[in-house]
Every structure is written in structure tokens, then in C-alpha cells.
């Protein structure tokens, strides 16, 4: 599938991307691939060139209902509830040398990830969305686990498949957030 189809899918969302006209994306990608010792998939490279480090926002959000951009993974991770079929996407890392720097994210996790796995985006709770650069698969990394062979869960078989799994998900209000203050009293307090 061509990058054009990925671009079409991404038009479903508002893309908040930092613009850095002084960045030579081809040079940055060349340096990045040299650092990781492998080629990135072409659709992911095209994504980095066009959007860089970015956040996706739902176009469905209204005054009444707020939406998050989520993905539907192939394999559930420990952070998903029993009835959940989506997980939150926070933001993608990019080529600029800023807080969304892909190279900085790779460096940060180099001692926790196998050599062939790099972070490409952040997920809720300090978890990461990663790419296995040997096969292009997209994985969820659970930051609370400490067994490299068990810390990763399959999201998608390719970057393209990952992008096509993105959906708008309404943010559920807390069930107890009904404007009523609940107070629990200990029985010992009541008997004194």
C-alpha cells in the first residue's frame, strides 16, 4: 500500500506537528538508520518526513463529548480492561532534536529494549509504542514489566496496519463524577 493511503487515513484526525524547516529530514533519517544499524520501513520514513514528532487529535470532540485517538491492538496488553479493545496513543516521536526526539527516545530505552526494538510513539502511563526494526511489527511495551521477552505485546504487523487501526474513542466520564461528594465513615468513628 502506498503512503498516500496512510495520508488519507490520517486526514480523519487533526495533526498537531511541530514544523522545523531547518531540519534536513533525509540527512536525519540517514544518521538515525546508521545509529540503529538497520533500515526503517519506507512508509514509516515517509511519515517521519511529512509529520515528524506529532500528536493526533480527534475531529469528533465537541463541547459535550471529548474523544481520544486510540488504536486497536491485535493482542491485549495488561493495561487494557476486560471490555476494552483500544489503547490510547499519546504522540509520535520525530526527527527534530526536541522533547519528541526519536533519537532521544531510542537512547533513553536502549538499555531496556532488545537491540531490534525502538520506541516510535508514547502511550498512556509511561508505556511505549515500539517498532521491531527486523520485521516492521508494531509492539506495545509495558514499562512495569522487567522481562524483555514478556514486556512486548503485538499491536500491528506493520506501521501501515497500525495507522489503519487508529480510531476516535469517546472519553468516558468517571462513574462517580456525578457532582455528589461521597464520604465513607468507619464503623469505629460512628460508635464513639
From Swiss-Prot:
Family annotation (Pfam families): SUKH_6
Domain of life of the organism encoding this protein: Bacteria
Disulfide bonds listed in the record: none
Annotated InterPro entries: Knr4/Smi1-like_dom, Knr4/Smi1-like_sf
Protein name: SPbeta prophage-derived uncharacterized protein YokK
Amino acid at each position: 500500500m502506498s503512503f498516500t493511503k496512510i495520508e488519507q487515513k490520517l486526514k480523519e484526525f487533526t495533526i498537531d506537528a511541530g514544523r522545523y524547516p531547518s531540519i534536513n529530514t533525509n540527512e536525519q533519517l540517514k544518521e538515525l538508520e546508521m545509529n540503529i544499524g538497520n533500515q526503517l520501513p519506507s512508509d514509516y520514513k515517509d511519515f517521519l518526513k511529512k509529520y515528524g514528532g506529532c500528536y493526533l487529535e480527534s475531529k469528533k470532540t465537541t463541547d459535550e463529548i471529548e474523544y481520544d485517538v486510540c488504536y486497536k491492538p491485535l493482542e491485549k496488553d495488561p493495561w487494557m480492561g476486560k471490555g476494552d479493545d483500544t489503547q490510547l496513543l499519546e504522540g509520535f516521536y520525530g526527527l527534530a532534536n526536541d522533547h519528541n526526539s526519536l533519537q532521544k527516545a531510542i537512547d533513553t530505552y536502549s538499555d531496556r529494549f532488545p537491540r531490534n526494538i525502538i520506541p516510535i510513539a508514547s502511550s498512556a502511563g509511561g508505556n511505549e509504542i515500539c517498532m521491531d526494526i527486523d520485521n516492521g511489527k508494531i509492539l506495545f511495551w509495558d514499562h512495569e514489566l522487567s522481562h524483555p521477552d514478556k514486556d512486548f505485546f503485538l499491536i500491528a504487523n506493520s506501521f501501515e496496519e497500525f495507522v489503519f487501526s487508529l480510531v476516535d474513542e469517546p472519553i468516558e466520564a468517571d462513574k462517580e463524577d456525578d457532582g455528589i461528594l461521597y464520604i465513607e465513615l468507619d464503623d469505629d468513628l460512628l460508635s464513639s
